[in-house]
């Protein structure tokens, strides 16, 4: 069941990342049994790593914290709908549910290419029913607006 405080934590994580110049406005929180297991944010620029998206960063930390590669019974909160790469990692990690704020189209409006990759990879009709659920888009759009007004590197 959706809990807004976990999305707020993802937003805070994303803000910290963009304030440090680490990457885009993408933060994530992983929750298990109502407890935060890990948070992460986009570190593409900081780490010179095109795979270090917020969801991937959070998954890596959660797996280390739990000392397992299997995040069954975990939920992921993210400021944006996962790109195809992140979605694949989420599925590989066995995360049960994803709550997201902004859409791939919102990402494109601030300069990111997620929608392009989505078209290449195909639709999401094969996903389990209600696997992806959108919440708090307006809160996440505020974060995107803030980011869009910054001097930044788009990748």
Named regions from a protein language model:
Residues 22-26, 72:
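Short, basic and Ser/Thr-rich N-terminal targeting/leader segments
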């Amino acid at each position: 069941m959706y809990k807004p405080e976990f999305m707020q934590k993802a937003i805070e994580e994303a803000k910290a990342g963009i304030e440090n110049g680490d990457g885009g406005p993408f933060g994530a929180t992983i929750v298990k049994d109502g407890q935060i297991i890990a948070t992460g944010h986009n570190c593409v620029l900081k780490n010179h790593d095109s795979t270090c998206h917020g969801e991937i960063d959070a998954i890596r930390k959660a797996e280390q914290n739990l000392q397992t590669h299997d995040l069954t019974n975990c939920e992921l909160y993210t400021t944006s709908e996962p790109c195809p790469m992140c979605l694949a990692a989420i599925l590989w990690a066995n995360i049960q549910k994803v709550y997201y704020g902004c859409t791939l189209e919102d990402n494109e409006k601030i300069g990111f290419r997620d929608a392009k990759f989505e078209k290449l990879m195909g639709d999401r009709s094969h996903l389990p029913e209600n696997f992806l659920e959108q919440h708090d888009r307006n809160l996440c759009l505020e974060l995107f607006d803030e980011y869009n007004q910054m001097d930044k590197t788009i990748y």
